Swiss-Prot record:
Residues 2-295 form the FERM domain. This is Moesin. Residues 322-342, 358-453, 468-549 are annotated as: Disordered. The modification Phosphothreonine is found at residue 558. The gene is Msn. It is a peripheral membrane protein.
Length: 577
């Protein structure tokens, strides 16, 4: 049994360990990786490794892993990376996993400044990256400092502005809040839609020379070949779409491109090393094949993948809508509960007030009852005295009668009796007056008692009403491989058909131009960052970008411009650079 070989493959967000046989091919290892991570859009990707000369190289799929120039270490180290880029991410990247791998790789390129990104776009992209990681902003969860552990902006951008970490976080947070309701997967796609408009996105640069020996850059991307001046990798000067190229070949350091236009001369340039020409050839073949494939109807497999992706997206949207609905219901229930609690507290307070009023009324009633009793006793005393006076008056009357009788009987003592009579008469008069006074007082006491009785009845009625108020019940709660040959030359025919004439990429506009929301955000960010910018720290790329903006250029306008004229004119222009 042959001894197995340990292999470690690092994707953009995972580390995979495999044990392979000595005869395992690059394709077998590649297939094992894509199966493990659930990736079906395999045509964009490849396995990268550092060879024995420390050059970054793509693993050849048709050769054994052990037969290639991989460093003999344990485990063997590979990176799973995107080798080819789509023309339009929203049209071509189907699976969420594909979009995520591109997102992470592009983000890394932007943060490392391998892809130039202006400051305002960098902040906007950072907000989409935050949305994809954290979801909707929630002030209860995302407290101050929640982005402290995240690298979100290129070091160049941080150094060019007089803003501290908290101030950067505040700005990113504002835009994070703007993306409320956006699915994490949609935030990833929005990030890529903006990033693909960056001039250096998806471009592989190679240092070349023309026949004159001028130092230039060759850019190989999804749309064709572009030529750049040595000091400007943002603005290509000449462009050749894949649809104009018939054959590509190299012999040692010389690279030859034959155009479809037979009247046009060969497009020749020189690379510093043979291995670079091998890589250019592999990239040209892969990008050309994908360029042609895009201009044909989708294969059954791609159609199925798109249908499945649509279904999955629809399912996620349904789940999201359901979650949002549940969230709203929960929030409404919480508000209703708070309202009920508030009403309960108000009713309890009202009940307390009623109890206090009842207690006060009870005390007043008791006081009035006591006062009524006192007045009744006083009335009884006055009545008793009146009765006593009446009795005394009667007795005086009787005495008077007796005296009169005595007067008749005793004429002798008439004068004396007359005198006594006068006295008794005066006494009777006094007693009569006293009786009338007492009767008047008794009547007054009677009236007061009657008034107190009426107040008492009224208070009893109020108390009865208060006591009959119902008790408030508490409410219820609710590949293309690089050539294997050791030879110093290789050639590839780039087949073309009727679809090759489709150059729809020249009609494209940037996301900022067609999306008013993105345009508005970028304008606001440009204005916001201008005050904090340190102009002395501008880089060459910053100045080139600013000049392009001033002239109204963007990636696609430049593309249209550099493809003007026939192939011969552009090759002549390249030779004269």
């Amino acid at each position: 049994m042959p001894k197995t070989i340990s292999v470690r493959v690092t994707t953009m967000d995972a580390e995979l360990e495999f044990a392979i046989q000595p005869n395992t091919t690059g394709k077998q290892l590649f297939d094992q990786v894509v199966k493990t991570i659930g990736l079906r859009e395999v045509w964009f990707f490849g396995l990268q490794y550092q060879d024995t000369k420390a050059f970054s190289t793509w693993l050849k799929l048709n050769k054994k892993v052990t037969a290639q120039d991989v460093r003999k270490e344990s485990p063997l180290l590979f990176k799973f990376r995107a080798k080819f880029y789509p023309e339009d991410v929203s049209e071509e990247l189907i699976q969420d996993i594909t979009q995520r791998l591109f997102f992470l790789q592009v983000k890394e390129g932007i943060l490392n400044d391998d892809i130039y990104c202006p400051p305002e776009t960098a902040v906007l992209l950072a907000s989409y990256a935050v949305q994809s990681k954290y979801g909707d902003f929630n002030k209860e969860v995302h407290k101050s400092g929640y982005l402290a552990g995240d690298k979100l902006l290129p070091q160049r951008v941080l150094e060019q502005h007089k803003l501290n970490k908290d101030q950067w976080e505040e700005r990113i947070q504002v835009w994070h809040e703007e993306h409320r309701g956006m699915l994490r997967e949609d935030a990833v796609l929005e990030y890529l839609k903006i990033a693909q408009d960056l001039e250096m996105y998806g471009v592989n640069y190679f240092s070349i020379k023309n026949k004159k020996g001028s130092e230039l850059w060759l850019g190989v991307d999804a749309l064709g070949l572009n030529i750049y001046e040595q000091n400007d990798r943002l603005t290509p000067k000449i462009g050749f779409p894949w649809s104009e190229i018939r054959n590509i070949s190299f012999n040692d350091k010389k690279f030859v491109i034959k155009p479809i236009d037979k009247k046009a001369p060969d497009f020749v340039f020189y690379a510093p090393r043979l291995r670079i020409n091998k890589r250019i050839l592999a990239l040209c073949m892969g990008n050309h094949e994908l360029y042609m494939r895009r201009r044909k109807p989708d294969t059954i497999e791609v159609q199925q993948m798109k249908a499945q992706a649509r279904e999955e997206k629809h399912q996620k949207q349904m789940e999201r809508a359901l979650l949002e609905n549940e969230k709203k219901k929960r929030e409404l229930a919480e508000k209703e509960k708070e309202k009920i609690e508030r009403e309960k507290e108000e009713l309890m307070e009202k009940l307390k007030q009623i109890e206090e009023q009842t207690k006060k009324a009870q005390q007043e009633l008791e006081e009035q009852t006591r006062r009524a009793l006192e007045l009744e006793q006083e009335r009884k005393r006055a009545q008793s005295e009146a009765e006593k006076l009446a009795k005394e008056r009667q007795e005086a009357e009787e005495a008077k009668e007796a005296l009169l009788q005595a007067s008749r009987d005793q004429k002798k003592t008439q004068e004396q009796l007359a005198s006594e009579m006068a006295e008794l008469t005066a006494r009777v008069s006094q007693l009569e007056m006293a009786r009338k006074k007492k009767e008047s007082e008794a009547e007054e006491c009677h009236q007061k008692a009657q008034m107190v009785q009426e107040d008492l009845e009224k208070t009893r009625a109020e108390l009865k009403t208060a006591m009959s108020t119902p008790h408030v019940a508490e409410p219820a709660e609710n590949e293309h491989d690089e050539q294997d040959e050791n030879g110093a030359e290789a050639s590839a025919e780039l087949r073309a058909d009727a679809m090759a004439k489709d150059r729809s990429e020249e009609e494209r506009t940037t996301e900022a131009e067609k999306n008013e929301r993105v345009q508005k955000h970028l304008k606001a960010l440009t204005s916001e960052l201008a005050n904090a910018r340190d102009e002395s720290k501008k880089t060459t790329n910053d100045m080139i970008h600013a000049e392009n903006m001033r002239l109204g250029r963007d990636k696609y306008k430049t593309l249209r411009q550099i493809r003007q004229g026939n192939t011969k004119q552009r090759i002549d222009e390249f030779e004269s650079m």
